[in-house]
């Protein structure tokens, strides 16, 4: 069974078991728990679709891989090995299936990584706060998904999920949530 992401997904990072449950109920499909085993277990119990394990470097992959295997994670972030497309190539060369590698890029690099055939993770948040920051993150998320990003990292989960649903409906890759027809 292939685990390729069929549509865009929302990722968030959590630091407590309570945050893991809250993220799952808010609609996050992918949760980055770092290398905290208690969070890994909590996230798996929350039935989040995908778990990304380990913020580490190449030296950490032997330590993080058993954690990922014990938790049932199928998607390893290419940043485990160093980040970017070269790390993804190294991971594929080391025997990790391409459909299990998630490449973390900047918004400007989404198109190139997607065209190269990788599943793409992009962080759309910035350091600003408030409604303007949420709107900007939503706009960035929509453009990134249109260009091929599979996973969006954000702290604005519900708002970004709505933006992604709208973008996928416009693109034709998902039906609209509701259709309204009328005469103007």
Where are each of the predicted segments found?
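Active-site-adjacent loop and "lid" segments of alpha/beta metabolic enzymes
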Residues: 1-26, 38-184
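Alpha-helical structural signal with a strong bias for long, charge-/Ser/Thr/Gly-rich
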Residues: 30-31
């Amino acid at each position: 069974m292939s685990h390729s992401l069929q549509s865009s997904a929302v990722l968030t990072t959590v630091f407590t078991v309570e945050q893991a449950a809250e993220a799952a109920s808010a609609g996050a499909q992918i949760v980055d728990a770092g290398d905290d085993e208690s969070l890994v277990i909590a996230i798996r119990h929350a039935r989040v679709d995908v778990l990304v394990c380990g913020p580490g470097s190449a030296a950490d992959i032997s330590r993080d891989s058993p954690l990922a295997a014990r938790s049932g994670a199928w998607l390893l972030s290419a940043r485990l090995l160093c980040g970017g497309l070269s790390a993804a190539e190294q991971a594929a060369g080391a025997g990790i299936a391409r459909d299990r590698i998630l490449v973390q890029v900047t918004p400007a690099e989404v198109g190139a990584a997607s065209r190269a055939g990788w599943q793409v993770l992009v962080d759309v948040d910035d350091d600003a706060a408030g409604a303007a920051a949420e709107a900007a993150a939503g706009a960035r998320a929509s453009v990134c998904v249109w260009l091929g990003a599979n996973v969006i990292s954000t702290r604005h989960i519900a708002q970004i999920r709505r933006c992604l649903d709208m973008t996928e409906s416009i693109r034709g890759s998902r039906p609209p949530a509701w259709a309204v027809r009328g005469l103007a």
